[in-house]
Amino acid sequence: MRFWGSFLLVVILDRISKAWVLASFLPRESRSLIEGGLYLTYVQNRGAAFGLMPGKSWLFFISALLVIMALVIYNWRSKASPLEALSTGLIAGGALGNLIDRYFYGFVIDFIDLGWWPVFNLADSAIVCGGILLLILVLLDGKREERNA
């Protein structure tokens, strides 16, 4: 349930936030939330994370689809811990959010701008947070196995 809960929450919040950006901003329009620190800037990202490899949308679309399918199968077939399910749900939900953008628009809608980092979105944040949590879980599990060996 944690997988599907985090998965659906990420997809829903991502879609709502991007719909608001599309309705409220012109491309490249920026508004300050916290002067010098946080802006909302509408960017059409045609590449991968941070705008890398522009023009390869088909590659990212297929990759995201494979990741989502693998994570759904993993959670369906394994006895993932609640934190594993949460982390993989965040990753899969973020991947689906960006996949939906690529399918309907041919680009990903990015809008969170820290001023010193490439512009990103809620789906990207979910992927990163889920990935970090999963990495921590793997590292902790490895240390536990070393102690038990």
Swiss-Prot record:
Catalytic activity line of the entry: Release of signal peptides from bacterial membrane prolipoproteins. Hydrolyzes -Xaa-Yaa-Zaa-|-(S,diacylglyceryl)Cys-, in which Xaa is hydrophobic (preferably Leu), and Yaa (Ala or Ser) and Zaa (Gly or Ala) have small, neutral side chains
Primary localisation category: membrane
Residues passing through the membrane, by range: 53-73, 89-109, 119-139
Topology relative to the membrane: Multi-pass membrane protein
Active-site positions on this chain: D110, D124
One Pfam family here: Peptidase_A8
Localisation per UniProt entry: Cell membrane
EC annotation from Swiss-Prot or TrEMBL: 3.4.23.36
Major enzyme class: hydrolase
One of the record's GO cellular component terms: plasma membrane
Gene Ontology molecular-function annotations: aspartic-type endopeptidase activity
InterPro entries from the UniProt entry: Peptidase_A8 (IPR001872)
GO biological process terms on file: proteolysis
The protein's annotated pathway: Protein modification; lipoprotein biosynthesis (signal peptide cleavage)
Swiss-Prot/TrEMBL keywords: Aspartyl protease, Cell membrane, Hydrolase, Membrane, Protease, Transmembrane, Transmembrane helix
Function of the protein: This protein specifically catalyzes the removal of signal peptides from prolipoproteins.
Sequence similarity: Belongs to the peptidase A8 family.
PANTHER family attached to this UniProt entry: LIPOPROTEIN SIGNAL PEPTIDASE (PTHR33695:SF1)
Name this protein carries in UniProt: Lipoprotein signal peptidase
